[in-house]
């Protein structure tokens, strides 16, 4: 190939690539973005007293579950597992609530993305109900799901070791630097993970009901996390920022409002701290949909036209509770 031919072919290749790139841009417009403020109009109507709270008819059922998030579907799973089926579930503002997901497209190659919770840490040894649920849903495998759970590699994702970008470089863990206070705090947390009371109960366990009831630990519930940190002499701004962030993320309040027990429980109660987490393309919507299948939840367009429900199969309706009033062992 002489020089003229080489330059001709190079120009042709460059022109073809440029044309293809422009064609790709023309045919693949970025999707438009819209914000769905779930429940906002109804919340404003309630705030402004624009909705009547008096009921127009009375209906009853064995069990009414409000919402369709993790707590609601877990409750339905437990009831069905124990033989109850006369259950009505009010879906709430969004299907699957805090486990909701978004699907773009209707084919097998559709894009799925979580709009709610997106991962689940591997359940601790004390979280036997969660392990049992995951076993029922086929997520935990093996003959000893409660004591020796086996997970599919397709369901596990390892967290990156380096995920904080600060001062021009990546840092291991979740903090840009490990100062003396930070090291001391996490060394203390490492001991708390194995701390037990005189009865052999873990000081901090998940679920929290299995945590020690001993006064030496429960007295931490009477002071704030911020007060405890000051008592222990922690002054690092980086550590304080991180602990406040964690509390706001999990509890909705910072270290000045969250109790010391709750703050320490966040770090000390989780088993498998550095293990891979369970996640899917649509986040925990994957578990929510599996729960619906396990329960056999059938969707209804409206409430059944009867005064007393005798559902043979759990059902759901697109409804929201505006007012809940306790009345003995029942609610209105």
Q: Predicted segment positions?
A:
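Mobile amphipathic helical/loop "lid" adjacent to a hydrophobic cofactor/ligand pocket
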Residues: 135, 143-257, 273
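Short, solvent-exposed loop/turn and secondary-structure capping segments
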Residues: 77, 98-102, 131, 176
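Glycine-rich active-site loop/strand segments that organize a redox cofactor
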Residues: 97-128, 210-212
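Active-site/ligand-binding neighborhood in enzyme catalytic cores
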Residues: 203-330
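N-terminal Rossmann-like FAD-binding beta1-loop-alpha1 element of flavoenzymes
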Residues: 62-89
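Extreme N-terminal leader/targeting segments of oxidoreductases
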Residues: 1-62, 81
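Feature captures the FAD/FMN-dependent oxidoreductase FAD-binding
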Residues: 126-182, 295-331
């Amino acid at each position: 190939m002489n020089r003229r031919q080489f330059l001709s072919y190079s120009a042709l290749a460059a022109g073809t690539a440029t044309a293809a790139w422009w064609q790709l841009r023309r045919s693949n417009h970025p999707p438009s973005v819209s914000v769905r403020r779930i429940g906002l109009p109804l919340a404003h109507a309630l705030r402004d007293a624009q909705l009547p709270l008096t009921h127009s008819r009375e209906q009853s059922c064995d069990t009414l579950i409000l919402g369709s998030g993790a707590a609601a579907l877990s409750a339905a799973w437990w009831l069905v597992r124990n033989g109850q089926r006369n259950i009505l579930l009010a879906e709430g503002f969004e299907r699957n609530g805090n486990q909701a997901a978004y699907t773009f497209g209707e084919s097998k190659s559709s894009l799925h993305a979580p709009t709610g919770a997106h991962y689940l840490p591997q359940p601790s040894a004390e979280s036997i109900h969660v392990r049992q649920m995951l076993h029922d849903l086929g997520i935990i495998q093996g003959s000893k799901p409660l004591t020796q759970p086996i997970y599919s590699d397709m369901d596990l994702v390892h967290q990156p070791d380096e995920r904080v970008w600060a001062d021009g470089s990546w840092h291991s863990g979740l903090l840009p630097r490990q100062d003396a206070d930070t090291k001391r705090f996490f060394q203390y947390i490492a001991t708390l993970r194995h701390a037990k009371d005189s009865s052999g109960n873990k000081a901090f366990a998940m679920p929290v009901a299995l945590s020690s009831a001993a006064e030496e630990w429960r007295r931490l519930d009477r002071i704030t996390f911020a007060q405890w940190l000051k008592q222990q002499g922690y002054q690092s701004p980086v550590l304080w920022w991180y602990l406040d962030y964690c509390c706001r993320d999990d509890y909705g309040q910072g270290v000045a409002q969250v109790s010391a027990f709750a703050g320490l429980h966040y770090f000390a109660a989780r088993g498998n701290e550095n293990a891979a987490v369970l996640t899917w393309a649509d986040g925990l919507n994957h578990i929510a949909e599996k729960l619906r299948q396990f329960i056999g939840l059938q969707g209804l367009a409206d409430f059944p036209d009867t005064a007393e429900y005798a559902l043979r199969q759990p059902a759901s309706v697109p409804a929201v509770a505006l007012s809940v009033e306790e009345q003995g062992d029942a609610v209105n």
